[in-house]
Amino acid sequence: MAVEPQTGRLSAGRAQLLAIAFALVSGMSAVIASALASHALGHYSPTAQASWDVAARMHLAHSLLMLLMSLCWAQHAYRLLGVSCLLLGLGVILFSVNIYARVLFGDSFVSRLTALGGLCLMAGWLVPLPILSDLWRRHGTGALRS
């Protein structure tokens, strides 16, 4: 984080801006994936369509979480928020994109990484937890009540 000399406001660094941009593009691509599911995958099996739907829902939900984490990271210099963004982005790629590829192209070695993507998504939720402890220590119990 840097302080802008003219305004005295904190400005986000390149990594934070990149995380925000990635989250926005990821969210847009999740919407595209959902549109494809309802308009272009009619000839695929119900199992394939259900897999695609799960991937698209997970993609969108975690893109929103990644956007939230990246916006918080741009405001507060907690490195764990950046780690969370990285894990969520990697998780979306390894989980959702692998499922999309498996539906379109069939099973491959790369699709075996889907479980690793799921673990990255789970870790993306948990990594910021120590920030709560830090906030608790700094501000006492009142910080979490208000």
Where are these regions (language model features)?
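Core segments of alpha-helical transmembrane spans in multipass integral membrane proteins
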Residues: 25-36, 50-75, 79, 88-93
